[in-house]
Amino acid sequence: MNPIISAASVIAAGFAVGLASIGPGIGQGTAAGRAVEGIARQPEAEGKIRGTLLLSLAFMEALTIYGLVVALALLFANPFI
């Protein structure tokens, strides 16, 4: 096993998780803030806003999970070794 490839795989796995969580993290914070503003403006639409928010948060979180899967593939099932 080449130590340079192993080291690069560990660094790439770290970048994969880190970069894959930045965008969804910002998006989730923005979406939650806007949902709270929407509920404050229209309390009668709370159920619809909450349902839409939870669905969109699940889609955003899936992006982070994809980054984690790529990182795990690089660490444990590395195609470059």
Swiss-Prot record:
GO molecular function: lipid binding; proton-transporting ATP synthase activity, rotational mechanism
Localization in the cell: Plastid membrane
Transmembrane stretches, start-end: 3-23, 57-77
Keyword tags: ATP synthesis, CF(0), Hydrogen ion transport, Ion transport, Lipid-binding, Membrane, Plastid, Transmembrane, Transmembrane helix, Transport
Description of how the protein assembles with itself and partners: F-type ATPases have 2 components, F(1) - the catalytic core - and F(0) - the membrane proton channel. F(1) has five subunits: alpha(3), beta(3), gamma(1), delta(1), epsilon(1). F(0) has four main subunits: a(1), b(1), b'(1) and c(10-14). The alpha and beta chains form an alternating ring which encloses part of the gamma chain. F(1) is attached to F(0) by a central stalk formed by the gamma and epsilon chains, while a peripheral stalk is formed by the delta, b and b' chains.
Protein's UniProt name: ATP synthase subunit C, plastid
Gene Ontology terms: cellular component: plasma membrane; plastid membrane; proton-transporting ATP synthase complex; proton-transporting two-sector ATPase complex, proton-transporting domain
KW Chloroplast (keyword) present: no
Function field: F(1)F(0) ATP synthase produces ATP from ADP in the presence of a proton or sodium gradient. F-type ATPases consist of two structural domains, F(1) containing the extramembraneous catalytic core and F(0) containing the membrane proton channel, linked together by a central stalk and a peripheral stalk. During catalysis, ATP synthesis in the catalytic domain of F(1) is coupled via a rotary mechanism of the central stalk subunits to proton translocation. Key component of the F(0) channel; it plays a direct role in translocation across the membrane. A homomeric c-ring of between 10-14 subunits forms the central stalk rotor element with the F(1) delta and epsilon subunits.
Record site feature (Reversibly protonated during proton transport), residues: 61
Cystine pairings recorded for this chain: none
GN (gene name): atpE
Pfam families to which the protein is assigned, alphabetical: ATP-synt_C
Family statement drawn from the similarity comment of this UniProt entry: Belongs to the ATPase C chain family.
Primary location recorded for the protein, binned into one broad class: plastid
Membrane-related topology note: Multi-pass membrane protein
